[in-house]
C-alpha cells in the first residue's frame, strides 16, 4: 500500500514515531497491564506522566514560572465562552480583533456574556493577492484592557506573524492552529490557548496557558467545567479528563523535544511552506490569493483557474494517497494543511501530483 498523507485541517496528521509508540503501549501502557484508554487518571503512574508532559511543554515554549498550564475540555469553542465568563468581571468591555472566520466566531460568542468592542482589521489587495494591516496599525482602544485575536486563520490561510506589542493591555491569543509550529514570546500574552487536533494530538483536550494574576482575578459563579480556578486547584482533573488525548499530546511534546525543539520545527515548517508557495507562484494553472507577508505556514489555500476541475482534482488526489485537500465550504477551493507532523516528502508528493494534473488538464 502506498504512503497516505493527511492534509486535513484537523484532526491532523500525527508523527509516525508517535503512532508507533501508541501502538506499542495501547494494550499495555507502562507495563501496567492496562490499556492507556483504561488507566485511572488518579493513578500515580499517570499523574507522574502528566507532570512530565507539563514540564516538556513549559520547556518547549519557554513558559515563565508565573504562568500556569491547564488542560481542559471543549476545544477552542469552549474557550470562546470560558474567556469572557472568567475574565469579564475585571475587564468589562474587551476588544476583539476580527481578522477572519475564527476570530469572528470568538467575538460572536463573547457577545453572550459582555459587549465586546469588535475591531475589523483592514484588508488590502496587491497584485490580486490579499493581505491585512499590521498589528501596529490596529485601532485599539486604550480603555479596554483585554484584547483577543487569532494569529492564524485556517480557512483563508492568513497568518499574522507580528506579535502585538501593547503596553498595559492583556493580550489573549487563540493559537489552536499555530502553537508549537514556531516560537512564541509567552511574556507578551496574558493568556494563550489551543485545541489539540492540529499540532498537539487527537481532539479532546485543550491547552490553556494563563498568567497568575489573571487566574487569581477570575469570576466565581461560572460553570465548574469552564472555571479556570477550579481547573487549577484540581490540577486539571476536576472531572475525568481525556486520558488518551493527554497521553498522545505528551508523546508529541517528547517528539518535538527529540527533534531539537521549536527552532528545528520552525525551520522545517518554513521550508515546507516555501516550496509549496514557490510552486504555486510558478504556475498559471493554480493560484494563491494571499500576499507572502500573510501566507500561512500551516494552511496553504489555493485554487485552479479552471474551477470546474476542482472536485475532479480532489478525487484524483485521493487516488494518489493525498487526502483532505478540499477547501472549507465557506470559500471553496483547495487547502493543504501542513502542520508539524507533515513531512517534507508529503509536500513534495503533493507538488508532483499537481504538476502531473496540470500536464493532463492544463
From Swiss-Prot:
Major subcellular location class: cytoplasm
Record's cofactor remark: Binds 1 pyridoxal phosphate per subunit.
PANTHER family: PHOSPHOSERINE AMINOTRANSFERASE
Sorted UniProt keywords: Amino-acid biosynthesis, Aminotransferase, Cytoplasm, Pyridoxal phosphate, Pyridoxine biosynthesis, Serine biosynthesis, Transferase
GO CC, alphabetical: cytoplasm
GO molecular-function terms, A-Z: O-phospho-L-serine:2-oxoglutarate aminotransferase activity; pyridoxal phosphate binding
Assembly and oligomerization: Homodimer.
Protein name (Swiss-Prot/TrEMBL): Phosphoserine aminotransferase
Superkingdom: Bacteria
Record pathway: Amino-acid biosynthesis; L-serine biosynthesis; L-serine from 3-phospho-D-glycerate: step 2/3; Cofactor biosynthesis; pyridoxine 5'-phosphate biosynthesis; pyridoxine 5'-phosphate from D-erythrose 4-phosphate: step 3/5
Record-listed E.C. numbers: 2.6.1.52
Protein's organism: Buchnera aphidicola subsp. Cinara cedri (strain Cc)
Pfam families: Aminotran_5 (PF00266)
GO BP field: L-serine biosynthetic process; pyridoxine biosynthetic process
Stretches of the chain forming a coiled coil according to its record: none
Cofactor: pyridoxal 5'-phosphate
Function (record text): Catalyzes the reversible conversion of 3-phosphohydroxypyruvate to phosphoserine and of 3-hydroxy-2-oxo-4-phosphonooxybutanoate to phosphohydroxythreonine.
Family membership: Belongs to the class-V pyridoxal-phosphate-dependent aminotransferase family. SerC subfamily.
Compartment(s): Cytoplasm
InterPro entries per UniProt: Aminotrans_V_dom, Aminotrans_V_PyrdxlP_BS, Pser_aminoTfrase, PyrdxlP-dep_Trfase, PyrdxlP-dep_Trfase_major, PyrdxlP-dep_Trfase_small
Positions that bind pyridoxal 5'-phosphate: 76-77, 102, 154, 174, 197, 239-240
Reactions accelerated catalytically: O-phospho-L-serine + 2-oxoglutarate = 3-phosphooxypyruvate + L-glutamate; 4-(phosphooxy)-L-threonine + 2-oxoglutarate = (R)-3-hydroxy-2-oxo-4-phosphooxybutanoate + L-glutamate
Binding positions (L-glutamate): 42
Modified residues (N6-(pyridoxal phosphate)lysine): 198
